[in-house]
C-alpha cells in the first residue's frame, strides 16, 4: 500500500508500514516502490535501542569520547604542572559529555544527571585560560571566552550576558545544535563579586546583578539570540538556544580569598589539639586547596552561583623551574615559536640555560606568570628580528643571561665564523 488514487487526478502517498497518508504525518520518505513515515522511523529506533544490550549501548556512547587519562595526557602537552587541577578537570569534562550521551540515548530514565560546571581559582598566568582552550580544541566543540568585567545587567551600558551565547554561535557558524554542546570560559569571575556579603538595597549592575544574570545562563535557560547578520526587520524571529548542556568554566585570581580561608581555618583551629602553622609557612596555593563554598560566598559570590559550580580546582603559583619548562617543553612553547620564526629567515636560535632562568625570574618579579614569558623574550629579540631580514651570513642568534638581565643585544654568529669553529 504505497499510493492510492483520490477523487482528483493527484496521487496520495501512504506509509507502507502503518498505512497513514502523507497528510497525516510530518515526513514521508520514499524507497524503491515503498514509503516510510517519520513516526515509524522513531518507533524502529526505539525498538532497536530497547533491544540493544546495556553494555553495548554504554560502549557505543563512549566510543569517540576520550577517557579522563586521554584528556589529561593531551593537557600535559600544553600545560606544565597543575597536576591536581588537570586530573579534576579531566574527570569533570569526561562526566559532562558522558552525561550528554546518556541523556540522548536514555530518554525516560528515572535518574537525572545534573551538570557540573567548573570554577578555576589561581593567580594570573597560572594556566586557567589555556586549560579551557586546550579542552575545547581536543573535544572539537565550539568555545568562547568572555571577560566578566565587561558584563552588565540587561538595560545598562555594557555587554549583556546573552552576548556570550551569541559569540558561541558565531564560533560555530550559527549551528545551534553544536553551540548547545559547547564550552564557555568566563574569566575574571572574581571581579564581579558583590561589595559585601550582605544583600544591598542599591543597584549593583556590574556585581551581584551580573551574577544573577549569569546564574540563569549557567543553570540552563532558553537564550534569545539575533540570527546571523542581525534581524533584518522587527518581525524576524530570534534564535532560541538552550544553555542546559553548555559547560561553563569560570576562572579568577580571587586576590584576598586566602585571608577569608585563613580566618575560617584559624577560628576552627583553636584548642590543645589544633595544629599550629604560621601564615608565613603556608603558600597561597596551600591555602586555596582548603577553599569551601562558604569562603566563596564570604568573598562576594552569591550562594546560588557557587552552588552551580560544584567542581572547584585550585591552580598553583608557578615556580621558576615550572616557568623554564613552560618556555621549552609544550607543543606551543614560546622558545619553539621563536625558533620557528628565525628558521624562516634561515637562522638558528639558541637560548642558553642561564638566559631561560633569567626570563623566568623576570616573569616572577613582574607577577605575570606564564603570560609574561613571551613579552620578555620578544623584548630582547625585537631589534635583532628587525635587522635580520636585511642581514647577510648570520648563522645563529644566541640569547645569553646578560641579554635578559642587562638588556644587551643577543650574540650573532656568522656563517664564516661558524665554519671555522
Swiss-Prot record:
Molecular function terms, GO-annotated: ATP binding; ATP hydrolysis activity; ATP-dependent protein folding chaperone; protein dimerization activity; unfolded protein binding; zinc ion binding
**Top-rank taxon, per record:** Bacteria
> What GO cellular-component annotations does this UniProt entry give?
HslUV protease complex
Positions bound to Zn(2+): 15, 18, 37, 40
Task: Tell me yes or no: is Nucleotide-binding among this UniProt entry's keywords.
Answer: yes
Known SUPFAM superfamilies for this protein? Answer: Glucocorticoid receptor-like (DNA-binding domain) (SSF57716), P-loop containing nucleoside triphosphate hydrolases (SSF52540)
**ClpX-type ZB domain residues:** 3-56
Q: Which keywords belong to this entry?
A: ATP-binding, Chaperone, Metal-binding, Nucleotide-binding, Zinc
| Record bears the keyword Transmembrane | no
Residues bound to ATP are 123-130
Q: Where is the signal peptide?
A: none
Name any Gene Ontology BP term.
Answer: proteolysis involved in protein catabolic process
**Family per record:** Belongs to the ClpX chaperone family.
Report the protein's function: ATP-dependent specificity component of the Clp protease. It directs the protease to specific substrates. Can perform chaperone functions in the absence of ClpP.
Q: How does it assemble?
A: Component of the ClpX-ClpP complex. Forms a hexameric ring that, in the presence of ATP, binds to fourteen ClpP subunits assembled into a disk-like structure with a central cavity, resembling the structure of eukaryotic proteasomes.
Q: Which NCBIfam families match?
A: clpX, PRK05342.1
Q: What is this protein called?
A: ATP-dependent Clp protease ATP-binding subunit ClpX
Question: Organism, per UniProt?
Answer: Variovorax paradoxus (strain S110)
| Gene expressing this chain | clpX
